[in-house]
């Protein structure tokens, strides 16, 4: 697994994955302190205010204000109980640690989400939740899976790699077959 700190709680581990959001939040706090300090001294803070506005816009655009709420929703969707959120990652089996890693990826919300056999180690409820998550995902998703029902529920295009050629088809996986 790619867990950064096995002794951290799963909620902290998942939230730590949102590195850019955390950087934007830290930078906003730094700028706020600088603006306060310089304005108390009567100095010009226009450039800092401009940067602060840009940082705040980026933070908001990335979902910084909803970070913890989104992390909790993703963890719950993948089968964790609220009481699990404060348990150390090390207490979970390999299958559950895979869910933690998947949660981290989903929280990062990349423009291109690459999923290799995402339904492995997931129960039916978690698979159904993941289907809904992918259906509402506002980026591109590339899925490699042997789970035909999952593919049918999630894809509207299929790329087939045969004889060193990629051919794309519009429709579900079953319609491709």
Language-model features, listed with the residues they occupy:
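ABC ATP-binding cassette signature C-motif
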Residues: 1-177
């Amino acid at each position: 697994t790619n867990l950064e700190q096995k002794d951290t709680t799963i909620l902290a581990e998942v939230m730590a994955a949102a590195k850019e959001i955390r950087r934007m939040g830290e930078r906003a706090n730094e700028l706020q302190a600088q603006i306060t300090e310089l304005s108390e001294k009567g100095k010009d803070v226009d450039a800092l205010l401009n940067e602060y506005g840009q940082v705040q816009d980026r933070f908001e655009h990335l979902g910084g204000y909803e970070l913890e709420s989104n992390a909790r929703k993703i963890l719950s969707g993948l089968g964790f109980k609220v009481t699990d959120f404060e348990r150390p990652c090390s207490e979970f089996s390999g299958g559950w640690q895979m869910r933690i890693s998947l949660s981290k990826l989903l929280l990062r919300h990349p423009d291109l989400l690459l999923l290799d056999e995402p339904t492995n180690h997931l129960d039916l409820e978690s698979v159904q939740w993941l289907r809904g998550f992918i259906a509402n995902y506002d980026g591109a998703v590339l899925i490699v899976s042997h789970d035909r029902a999952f593919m049918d529920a999630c894809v509207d295009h299929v790329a087939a790699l045969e004889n060193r050629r990629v051919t794309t088809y519009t429709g579900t996986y079953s319609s491709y077959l």
